[in-house]
């Protein structure tokens, strides 16, 4: 009797072990197959997103992706009687390209490839869809932008950074922020870039910085920021140079001897602003402007500033028609270099969302009218129901 009970117990244990082993094996097969099916879904990435903007993303809603996985599973398990496939469910929300985190991760990866020289500035345009709704143009493309509701403007580098007289600009190479900006300046053009493909904004980097709805407003906002930045830097140089300080003191004594200290500060600021205006003209004409000036790179003379200052009764006047002075700078950042400083200083979330804006605007304008970046995903979670159990698989680009 005891022997029979032991035999039954052993058989039960063995059968339980066999069943558990079988389930583990089935789950292993299902997990490997599930990863392969997810890989197939990821392989259907949008070519325009990839070729024009260096991003991987596939289009689809959760129900459609589940149907694809079900189809793959039924084909794979059709001749496997020990596997009973009971369907799948998918989760895409976490992987939307409209997520700042997801977009940033891809932008940083691509930015690193740009910095390494592996990826170049794209020379291809956006191809219109063969069978889709008609592309839209005009102000209609500005509707439902990812950055809608964000009002934060451009940030300048801190006055401490600008005023301490560093030879180099404050952009720190090698950080994720730096690689984001490399991505933006590679895949979006600024006002000085040659037109290689039709886009809505001529100055796309300027849009990222300013967020206005017209090129004119964006350019004006960026120029104002450059003027402010260069004025602070130029003033820092004037205050460090004894010869220039002596000139401004003498000019202040002539203009307002009874209030010389206050007038000297006004003259110094006016001189720095006049030099900043000239700096902006140089930058917008493709020239370089050193981050911190020296005697060779300083272009304006105080006499001209004083004449303008006196003519306006104490208010500096920078006439738009005045030709700029080119000191022939060899070193220093160009216009794109200064935009990089402004990009580096601005709010990262706003910056990423405005980059999404540009992609959505241009894709709606050139690809198909109902394009929304939120409908594209960079990965998926899938839950497979196999033999009464659940198997989870996850895959990203």
Predicted regions and their residues:
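Long, compositionally biased low-complexity segments
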Residues: 47, 55-397
């Amino acid at each position: 009797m005891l022997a029979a009970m032991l035999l039954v117990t052993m058989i039960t244990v063995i059968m339980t072990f066999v069943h558990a082993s079988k389930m583990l094996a089935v789950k292993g097969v299902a997990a490997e197959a599930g990863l392969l099916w997810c890989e197939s879904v990821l392989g259907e990435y949008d070519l325009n997103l990839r070729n024009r903007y260096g991003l991987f993303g596939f289009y689809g809603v959760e129900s459609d992706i589940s149907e694809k996985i079900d189809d793959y599973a039924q084909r794979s398990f059709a001749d496997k009687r020990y596997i009973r496939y009971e369907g799948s469910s998918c989760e895409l929300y976490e992987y939307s390209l409209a997520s700042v985190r997801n977009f940033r991760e891809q932008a940083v990866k691509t930015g690193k490839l740009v910095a390494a020289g592996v990826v170049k500035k794209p020379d291809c345009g956006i191809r219109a869809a063969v069978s889709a709704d008609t592309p839209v143009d005009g102000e209609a493309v500005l509707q439902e932008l990812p950055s809608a509701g964000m009002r934060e403007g451009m940030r300048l580098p801190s006055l401490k950074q600008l005023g301490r007289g560093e030879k180099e600009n404050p952009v720190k190479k090698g950080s994720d922020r730096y690689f984001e900006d490399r991505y933006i300046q590679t895949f979006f053009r600024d006002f000085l870039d040659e037109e290689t493909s039709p886009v809505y904004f001529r100055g796309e980097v300027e849009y990222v910085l300013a967020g206005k709805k017209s090129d004119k407003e964006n350019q004006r906002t960026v120029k104002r920021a450059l003027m402010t930045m260069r004025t602070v830097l130029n003033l820092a140089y004037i205050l460090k140079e004894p010869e220039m300080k002596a000139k401004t003191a003498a000019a202040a004594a002539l203009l307002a001897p009874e209030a010389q200290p206050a007038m000297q500060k006004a003259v110094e600021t006016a001189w720095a602003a006049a030099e900043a205006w000239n700096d902006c003209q140089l930058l917008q004409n493709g020239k370089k402007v050193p981050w911190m000036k020296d005697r060779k790179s300083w272009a304006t003379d105080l006499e001209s500033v004083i004449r303008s200052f006196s003519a306006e009764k104490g208010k500096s006047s920078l006439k738009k028609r005045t030709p700029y002075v080119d000191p022939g700078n060899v070193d220093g950042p160009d216009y794109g270099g200064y935009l990089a400083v402004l990009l580096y200083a601005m709010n990262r979330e706003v910056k990423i969302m405005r980059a999404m804006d540009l992609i959505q605007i241009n894709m709606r304008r050139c690809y198909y009218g109902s394009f929304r970046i939120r409908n594209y995903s960079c990965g998926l979670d899938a839950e497979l129901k196999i033999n009464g159990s659940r198997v989870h698989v996850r895959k990203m680009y």
